[in-house]
Regions:
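N-proximal, solvent-exposed amphipathic alpha-helical segments enriched in charged/polar residues
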Residues: 1-43, 51-53, 122-156
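Functionally constrained cores in energy, signaling, and assembly domains
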Residues: 11, 65-67, 84
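Hydrophobic beta-strand segments of well-ordered beta-sheets in folded domains
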Residues: 41-46, 79-82
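A short interface-forming secondary-structure element
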Residues: 48-61, 102
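Short, non-transmembrane amphipathic alpha-helical segments
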Residues: 56-77
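A short amphipathic beta-strand at an alpha->beta junction
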Residues: 72-95
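An exposed acidic His-Trp-rich patch
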Residues: 87-128
């Protein structure tokens, strides 16, 4: 994970590689990245493609915050991470957003988030503190084995 660190939010390939290494796709399914680098603070927006079930929302938002902390720690000039996600039809089909700034991430982990990306040891300490390692997903893909595992039913 530390090897995927990049100094620049404007390096789209490096940021996407880092996001994949962080596990954004494993956590939330298919996604796109939009980078706002025309002026500071630079932002990385994740646009999640699959809808989320309401009962998974709280846990998913916590994972978004954890993923954002890792991104903010490992992209030197990144100032915020934003998320855009949909709820399922039975949860009002709404599009919602979440943003975490570097300052908010620092408060979340209790120290300057940028220092958490200064060394593999500092990164590992943050990951352990965040209880980061997870293999659960929060998204719904209609008609897949994943639906059966989580007892989901998608109503579109």
């Amino acid at each position: 994970l530390y090897q995927a660190k990049t100094p620049y939010a404007g390096d789209a390939v490096a940021v996407k590689t880092l996001a994949d290494t962080v596990g954004v796709g494993n956590h939330f399914g298919a996604y796109h990245i939009s980078l706002e680098t025309s002026e500071e603070p630079y932002d990385c927006q994740f646009i999640i493609q699959y809808p989320m079930k309401g009962e998974k929302k709280e846990k998913a938002l916590e994972q978004m915050k954890k993923d954002a902390c890792v991104m903010l720690a490992l992209v030197d000039n990144l100032g915020s991470v934003s998320w855009e996600y949909m709820m399922t039809a039975e949860d009002n089909n709404g599009v919602e957003t979440l943003q975490m700034t570097a300052e908010e991430a620092s408060a979340y982990v209790g120290k300057n988030i940028k220092t958490c990306g200064e060394s593999p040891k500092a990164l590992q300490e943050m990951l352990t503190q965040l209880d980061f390692i997870t293999d659960e997903g929060f998204y719904v893909v209609s008609g897949t084995e994943r639906d059966e595992n989580y007892n989901f039913k998608v109503v579109i």
